[in-house]
Amino acid sequence: MVMSWLIITEKDNTARRIASILFKDVKTLKKGRVSYYHSPSNDAYVVGLKGHIVELDFPKELNNWTKTPLEKLLQAELVKKVKERTISSILKEIAKKADRVTVATDYDREGELIGVEALEIVKSVNPTVKVDRVRYSAVTEKEIRSAFSKPVKVDFNLANAALARQKIDLIWGATLTRLISVHSGRMGKDFLSVGRVQTPTLRLIVDRELEIQNFKPEKYYEIFAEFEGFIAKHPKRYGSKEEAEKLFAKIGETAKVEEFTRRRMEENRPTPFNTTEFLREASKFMSPHKAMNIAETLYMNGYISYPRTDNTVYPPTINLIEIVSALSSVFPREAQIVLSQDKITPSRGRRETKDHPPIYPTGVAKRGELSKDEWTIYELVVRRFLATLAPKAVWDVRRVVLDSNGVKFVANGRQLVEAGWRDIYIYSKAEETELPLLKKGDVLRILKKRLEEKETKPPGRYSASSLIKMMEKLNLGTKSTRHEIIQKLVSRRYIHGNPFRPSETAFSVINVLKETAETITLPDMTAKLENEMDLIAEGKKREPEVVDESREMLLQILRAIDYRKLSKDLREGVKKDKIVGKCPECGGELVVRQSKAGKRFIGCSNYPDCTFTLPLPQNGTLYITAKQCKEHEIKEVKIRTKKGYWNLGCPYCNYLNWKKENS
């Protein structure tokens, strides 16, 4: 009997590409709506999964949120469920006649677990089948052929680390979400989501907003002198106006050059993209979640390397010059800047890992072959890659120190002499400052002197970029999950905008948890669990042991909660999130309501005595902002749709304008 070879990939389009690379006689087979691929001459089958085809869940008898005790929920034995039955059926069918199974899922923790889940299905019908694993970082012919020429063993420790994360996140997420949702009265579609990583991340945003709200600006004073062609500044700033005025009065009509320096400064090139830096740069154009989805599509279609990586050093196995030469057909000017050098040496970051290289282009794409957003991400990856190989930028840097009656002034100037990598990486603006050539002893006339009163500014809100960086610093989540955490906070209406602003519900949830179960909101506990999962991957700890430790940790948190206070504070806080302002007719509270027909509107809390209402758009996610209308005691409203944010402004002003236009 001829035995078959079964190759398992993570997604269908990867299966299709790998099949076409390895075999010349590929036929597409179908079962229901699922396609898979067969090479008759090799009797090889390539089956693409849909990511996880098996999911973990709680037993059905624990589905009732209000009746199931939380301690029982967190101690429950989780059950596995096959969620893609057709794919499972195909795997079993082929596995029965297979003598070799190759796992070709993505090479990371999640990919290893996805492969192991499929293997368990295979081994349920063929327990003795030979199994191997191939690892690759790009879906290109060269990479795939190289990977299949040197298969390795499946890394069960790596898969178990992902399994531990899956179990812990499910246990913590379900338990805490039920805790908060039930005690706030927010269940059904409107439930309040809480999670192991999500909640400490949300606290960062809420705490920053509180810093901004509580910030008290302080006045300070700075002294400037204007000269022909430049402005100089006194190096010190003063909290006392009197002290500043005293010094200001000493300034004469001229200033003498005490020191003038001029030097050439080389500016280093950007380092190769790892996931964190890629998402931070991509967030200039779109949400990190969208950027990662597009990067994965480009990877599976052979245009860029694997986008989930910590590495910032190109391995010597990558033929950098070959890639640049190939890219010259689409980026000729940029490629020429790189190729015109006598020697090409790439920049290096601090982190070097052996699993995947930094993100780099693996195929040449033309603008017309990709969607607008796909091209934006592809171009970003290409330009970053070329910039890491380009010459350094060179600046002419100047500095002058001047003196006027004992009052010192300093000015700096810089001009870009050789653009180098800056001619390629167009996302980083070169800020130039004029400063003429001077020499020691020159006496310059002061055209104007200024004493400026300024105020200290509050810290800035977190942008997608700065939040990802802070999450990495605090070990919140992983390179593969941070963008998903941020997206979850947006979709659950905890945060909006970019930079991010928290909703009233976010304040309520975090403030209540800080008082009743602060551990949940701190990064320490989550970082500890991340370290434990690393130990599983290294084979130093067992998955059940880490999961049980996390259950015990959560149990202690639940037992320390004051449930009466939790319930009271949550219900009061959640109510605030629906309050839009004061009713102009009776002074009651205007709140967001829903009609029997399911339409949302703004109504008065004193209904039926007061029937004042305002219409609202029916599509998109509604956000009540902290900004209040200048004319009415009503907060402004924003709507988030697929196209972005729409600032509706004051709903009452909006309604009055509409009424005026349509009268």
Curated annotation (Swiss-Prot):
GO molecular function term, any single one: DNA binding
CDD domains assigned: TOP1Ac, TOPRIM_TopoIA_TopoIII
Location of the Toprim domain: 4-137
Site feature Interaction with DNA, where: H52, R165, D169, R308, R492
Cofactors (names): Mg(2+)
Residue spans, zinc finger C4-type: 583-610, 629-653
Catalytic activity: ATP-independent breakage of single-stranded DNA, followed by passage and rejoining
Alphabetized Pfam families for the sequence: Topoisom_bac, Toprim, Zn_ribbon_Top1
EC number: 5.6.2.1
Gene Ontology cellular component terms for the protein in this record: chromosome
One GO biological process term: DNA repair
Top EC category: isomerase
Keyword Metal-binding appears in the UniProt entry: yes
Residues annotated for Mg(2+) binding in this entry: E10, D106
HAMAP family noted in UniProt: Topoisom_1_prok (MF_00952)
NCBIfam families, per the entry: PRK07220.1 (NF005555)
Protein role: Releases the supercoiling and torsional tension of DNA, which is introduced during the DNA replication and transcription, by transiently cleaving and rejoining one strand of the DNA duplex. Introduces a single-strand break via transesterification at a target site in duplex DNA. The scissile phosphodiester is attacked by the catalytic tyrosine of the enzyme, resulting in the formation of a DNA-(5'-phosphotyrosyl)-enzyme intermediate and the expulsion of a 3'-OH DNA strand. The free DNA strand then undergoes passage around the unbroken strand, thus removing DNA supercoils.
Protein family according to the UniProt entry: Belongs to the type IA topoisomerase family.
Protein name: DNA topoisomerase 1
Source organism per UniProt: Archaeoglobus fulgidus (strain ATCC 49558 / DSM 4304 / JCM 9628 / NBRC 100126 / VC-16)
